């Protein structure tokens, strides 16, 4: 493992001699390899190194962000709380029995420095139901930040000897909690493909890597988009859209079939789903 490398570049991934170059301590180093796994995130060099003519991207940027606060306070509940309110979305999550993470839907124009801890806790209280509000413990923040939300997919996910995985290939809004799940499944498919290649001299897994990943990716993208659309206020929602959200939430709570579908997608579909 090499840390604090700079000027990382991938070369000849569509040719016979794939390799990676990087600079460290004033020297240029080269790593020769059979394959390159592009697990370097949304802003990494791997996807950016693919010619524009060889890749297609799909993206939706949502018109709001999540203001997150981390604090050493007892969680309001041991289960996640998702709140859809007239004031916007809120999420309560526990990191441990003594540390909690909370989120508020805010406009993209908001600035962290304009949100005091007191203002955050007051707004969170306004978005919680009376029972949760009663159990809310407040305290000084350890960290506050605003994260934009987007849906993004790049196709395909393989270019010769270069494989994209995780955020390098796709982003989901955090509402559905599917980002790490998708990254792990990408790596699982890639591990199996490389194991078959080196153990059995089979390229079947390599050749089908992108299609297998993307089938799962788009299912998770659909769920994350749907859940985000359901739980948040959009500028164009209007009175009719608000009623549709309320009806959908009522259906989820009172229909066993709908609840099962939500649970199946939230937990994460099995690796061989639909195979």
Language-model segments: what does each one mean?
Residues 37-44, 98-103, 121, 136-146, ...:
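Hydrophobic transmembrane alpha-helix bundles
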Residues 48, 70-72, 95, 108-109, ...:
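A generic structural signal for solvent-exposed, polar alpha-helical segments
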Residues 177, 192-275:
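C-terminal helical "tail/cap" subdomain of flavin- and related membrane-associated enzymes
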Residues 38, 146-226:
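Conserved mid-domain beta->alpha element of the FAD-binding
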Residues 1-4, 233:
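Short intrinsically disordered, low-complexity coil segments enriched in acidic
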